[in-house]
Amino acid sequence: MAENGLPCLDLLEATPGILRGLITELTGEDARWKPAPERFSVAEVLAHLSHSEGHCYRMRLDRFMAETRPEFEPDDAQMYLDLYRGVDPDEAFDQFEDQRETNIEFLRGLPDNAANRVALHREFGEITLAQMLNEWALHDLGHIRQVAELVRARKYQAGAGPMAASYHLKP
């Protein structure tokens, strides 16, 4: 927990480095590979993370701090799928990393009582900033897992030869 009482900041701060480690050996072709037409590629996951960082989480952070009981609409990631297609994975990652660094700096500068700020989410009801930060960490970890599975399937499964049969990948 951060000095100001906000949860999850260390994990949120670590996410870009974890992702960088996972994608470091991917080519552009690897990053654009999709296990199925309806599934995301690594590049699309990175674009989604970048978009969510600025257009969901940061906007909500600002409203948590500027308004009394702001009302939030549910976020519909499916609505933005077209934005993610054809993105440059390096650009998407760099944008995500820059935005995350800015957001962490902002979060670390919030006052001690910020965790208890309340908003009204139209789907989930009353939520606190601390709860949103925990959801943000859940979101990060889900996409870290997703990227890891995509990298495993694209980059390493074939090279494992017959031993790959003992792994049940779900990219």
Label each PLM-derived region with a short phrase.
Residues 1-29, 52-63:
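Alpha-helical bundle segments that constitute or directly flank the non-heme di-iron/ferroxidase center
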Residues 1-5, 82-89, 122-129:
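A short, mixed-charge helix-start or loop-turn motif at secondary-structure junctions
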Residues 3, 7-10, 34, 66, ...:
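Solvent-exposed interaction patches of small proteins and small membrane subunits
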Residues 5-13, 39, 43, 89-93, ...:
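Amphipathic, non-membrane alpha-helical segments in soluble helical-bundle scaffolds
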Residues 9, 20-23, 43-46, 50, ...:
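Non-transmembrane alpha-helical segments in soluble domains
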Residues 15, 78-117, 131-136, 144-146:
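Acidic/histidine-rich alpha-helical segments that form the ligand environment
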Residues 18-25, 29, 60, 106-113, ...:
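Amphipathic, soluble alpha-helical interaction motifs
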Residues 32-75, 118-171:
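Short, contiguous alpha-helical
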